Regions:
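Alpha-helical transmembrane segments of multi-pass membrane transport proteins
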Residues: 1-177
Length: 177
């Protein structure tokens, strides 16, 4: 993952994809990742160099327009774009997110991923229906992370989805009421 980000720094999309498809994708396929997931993984993470300091070309352009400090803008971009760093791993470990699998798996994995991202984002920001204290943030983060653990990792991972759904419903109900 780090190698994809480093090799993608300062390059256009097509160049990043060609370079990473030659250097990184074959290794991922060799260890058992499906070819589609491997190529989505490298493309997605290769483009994350646009918002990842120290290069963060897109963030630095935005900083110059806003007359803001470039590195601070880069770190803020990373914080706001945290899902973009997680999604490629979800592609690798949950192929149903790339429409490879049964419709039941697709529904379960997509709904868990959406709810997990939603809960983690609320926990990171510190606001849902109202301002969250440190315990509320921790509860939202924990529920979201449990939902983001792919069920394909093993039979134990299915239980993390159940616990994440129950905990997520509980913290949302607690915050809304």
């Amino acid at each position: 993952a780090v190698l994809c980000i480093v090799l993608g720094m300062g390059m256009p999309t097509v160049g990043v994809y060609i370079l990473l498809a030659i250097l990184i994708a074959p290794s991922l396929v060799e260890v058992g990742v499906s070819p589609l997931a491997a190529h989505m993984f490298i493309l997605y993470l290769g483009m994350m160099s646009l918002i990842t300091p120290p290069v963060a070309v897109a963030a630095f352009f935005a900083a110059s327009i806003a007359k803001a400090p470039p590195m601070a803008t880069g770190w803020t971009c990373m914080r706001f774009g945290w899902t973009a760093y997680v999604v490629p791993f979800l592609f690798v470990f949950s192929p149903s997110l790339l429409l490879q699998g049964t419709p039941g798996d697709l529904i379960i994995d997509v709904s868990s991923a959406i709810a997990g991202v939603w809960l983690v984002s609320a926990g990171m920001i510190g606001y849902f229906a109202r301002h969250l204290d440190i315990f509320g943030r921790a509860a939202f983060l924990t529920a979201g992370i449990l939902l983001l653990i792919p069920s394909e990792l093993g039979s134990w991972a299915i239980w993390t989805d159940w616990v994440g759904w129950i905990m997520g419903a509980g913290v949302v109900y607690w915050d809304v009421s």
